[in-house]
A protein has these predicted regions:
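Catalytic-core regions of core metabolic enzymes
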Residues: 1-193
Length: 193
């Protein structure tokens, strides 16, 4: 990383060097998202990188992730595969669905479904199938909640872990926050209600 120009990407990092490479990437002020596709990274390294990213206000996605794609903008990783699939999934323009998955195959399937039977996706994120992903569902749900173009989020989990339970708790708290705001908003036509 030290010798790479600011605009250069870096790939081909093996599991043993992933922790150090992740730390080096997070040091750079112009890098806000660190994405790692590598399988077989020790869990303690992944949890360290996740905590380190949080301290630095960065996003660490992975490891063992198929990638991230923002329609009409960029793709990190191999999500949706070959260029032909990107075009067939209409990823050249933004839709209104967010996608968060642990499964690479299911992320590709959900993107395809959203593009064929709806207006497509805003962003799709494969967080990786490992037991301890660098970023959990809740962090990405917060991101989508603050993205006005995203009207719905399709969250697809896998067996094991408590990520889905934490996402359900987040959603329940979100509903309560919405009810609290509605109670504080004055009623009547002069207030838009």
């Amino acid at each position: 990383m030290e010798d790479a120009p600011d605009s250069a990407g870096r790939d081909g990092i093996d599991a043993e060097r992933e922790k150090q490479s992740g730390i080096e990437a997070m040091i750079h002020t112009n890098i806000n998202v660190v994405y790692l596709i590598t399988d077989g990274v020790p869990e303690h390294d992944v949890t360290f990188l996740g905590r380190h990213a949080t301290k630095l206000w960065k996003v660490f996605n992975g490891s063992s992730s198929i990638g991230i794609v923002s329609a009409g903008s960029c793709r990190l990783g191999v999500i949706r595969g070959a260029f032909d699939n990107l075009v067939l999934s209409k990823l050249y323009r933004e839709g209104s669905f967010g996608v968060i998955t642990k499964s690479g195959g299911l992320s590709n399937e959900i993107i395809w479904i959203c593009s064929q039977f709806a207006d497509g996706i805003t962003t799709a994120i494969g967080i990786g199938g490992d037991a301890y992903p660098g970023t959990d569902y809740v962090s990405y749900l917060d991101m989508f909640e603050n993205a006005p173009q995203t009207k719905a989020v399709d969250l697809v989990g896998e067996m094991g872990g408590d990520l889905a339970e934490r996402a359900a708790e987040w959603y329940g708290a979100r509903e309560r926050r919405g009810a609290d705001r509605a109670e504080r908003t004055p009623a009547g036509p002069e207030h838009g209600r």
